[in-house]
């Protein structure tokens, strides 16, 4: 049996560690994506893989952009497991970012790690 003090300490430690485990956006869900499109939202689809060095470079930039644009909906597509989504978006490479304004794709980039072009890419949805 764990004491309440130990449980509280464990909870605090887990909470402190969470930001390092957090990722931008939310896992891709086709239905939620369609709802966002129908609502005319600005959307960023981030095709990523946990082992991808370019994706790791993009991650903090995407997180910053997400903070700068609170109305931006970000969906993470796992390159290794989300094969249906990869076909849907015609994606062949990880580290691909796709920007939508509602149902219309307005921009796409693969492998870009410079913050300025990525910000310009997302700005096309606003």
Can you name each region flagged by the protein language model?
Residues 1-25:
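N-terminal targeting signals for export/organelle localization
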Residues 25-42, 83:
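A short beta-strand-turn-helix
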Residues 40-43, 47-51, 93:
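Short pre-active-site segment immediately N-terminal to redox-active cysteine/selenocysteine motifs
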Residues 47, 66, 70-84:
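Thiol-based oxidoreductase modules, predominantly thioredoxin-like and allied folds used
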Residues 54-68:
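Typically the conserved alpha-helix immediately C-terminal to a functionally engaged Cys/Sec
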Residues 99-126:
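Non-catalytic, surface beta->alpha helical segment in thiol-disulfide oxidoreductase systems
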């Amino acid at each position: 049996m764990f004491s309440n003090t130990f449980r509280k300490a464990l909870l605090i430690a887990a909470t402190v560690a969470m930001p390092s485990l957090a990722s931008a956006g939310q896992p891709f869900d086709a239905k939620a994506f369609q709802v966002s499109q129908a609502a005319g939202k600005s959307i960023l689809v981030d095709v990523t893989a946990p082992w991808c060095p370019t994706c790791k470079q993009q991650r903090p930039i995407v997180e910053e952009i997400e903070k700068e644009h609170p109305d931006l909906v970000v969906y993470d597509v796992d390159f290794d497991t989300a094969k249906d989504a990869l076909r849907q978006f015609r994606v062949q490479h990880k580290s691909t970012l796709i920007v939508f304004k509602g149902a219309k794709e307005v921009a796409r980039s693969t492998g870009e790690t410079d913050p300025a072009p990525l910000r310009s890419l997302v700005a096309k949805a606003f």
